Each structure stands twice: as structure tokens, then as C-alpha cells.
């Protein structure tokens, strides 16, 4: 089987995508890991033979739905596991409705989930498609296992005594993009149309993030 794994943010996704690709290749599959634009061009031009396109998310934006449909029309199958996971959000209900839809799941041959909370919520919210939703875990989480300690190595500056790590990544306050661009991107992608309360939550979150970051 030909498998194409799309990578959007290499620092976040490349290692886990290569792990997935290595395991698939060991089973005899032909795997390409590349940026989305290159894969899309290869498929539209007919250069890449039909197979599985493994997407980083099933966000129901119009352009993504159209892209996946074009792939399906050329004989490709769509699979996905959401790279973002929703681990920093209490509950999974809002995430399941903002990052998925009946249409994007119906286009997919398989939807993989990080753990019990997301798979149970997805199966309940999208009960018509419950048989194609699987609890597999994420290859990103697999890389946290002790098996890969040597792969990551230990920084020379790492403390020798027990320590508490406090993440300084406040996703909205110190994002690489200004907050207004984040809002614009979400609006274009239809997040606020699908979940009218999300705009209020984002405004609340960015206020809290700025307080934590610059207090």
C-alpha cells in the first residue's frame, strides 16, 4: 500500500511521522513523508499513485473538505489522527465539534484517537461513523517512552536534582503569530461559525495567558 503522511509543522510532527513511516515500511508499505503542498501537487498531477493520505487533522474547513474529496475522486483513502490532541482542554466535547464534522469523518476511511476520552466522545458525537474510529494512541506520545530516551539525549545543562518543569508556552499570548492573525485564521477556517462560544473562550484564554506571561 502507498502511504502519504502530510507534515505541517516539522518541529512538532516530523519525528512522530518518521516513526509511523518506519513501522509502516517495516510491514512492506511504500511511505512518503512530506509537506502538504508537495503531496497535493503530486496527487493532482498524477505523479503519486493512489493509496492512503494520512492527514494531521479533519478540521471541516471548506478548502480541506475540497482537497480530501479531490483525493478520494482519484482513488485515495483518507485517514487521520489530530496532531493537537486537545490535551490542554478540559473535556473533549468542544474539541470534537471544532476539529471534526460529519462531512470530514464521512470522507475518512479511519479516524485514530489518542485515548479513551477522545475516542468515546467522537463515537458518541459521530455515532453514524463509530466503526471507523479507533483508539490507537498517538505516535507523538510513543516518543515519550523510555525506549526513545537515547534518541532524544539528555541536555548537558539538565539539572542533576529533581526539578519542576513549568511550560512557558502560552499558546495565544506568545504565539508566533499576533493574536489578531490567530483570530482571523480561525474565522476563515470556520471555527467560530461551528462553535459561536469559542470566540468568547479565546478572548478569555488570551487574557489569562497574557497575565501569566507578563505578570
Q: Predicted segment positions?
A:
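Conserved catalytic-core segment of nucleotide-activated headgroup transferases in glycan assembly
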Residues: 147-215
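Active-site and donor-binding regions of nucleotide-sugar-utilizing enzymes
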Residues: 2-154, 166-174
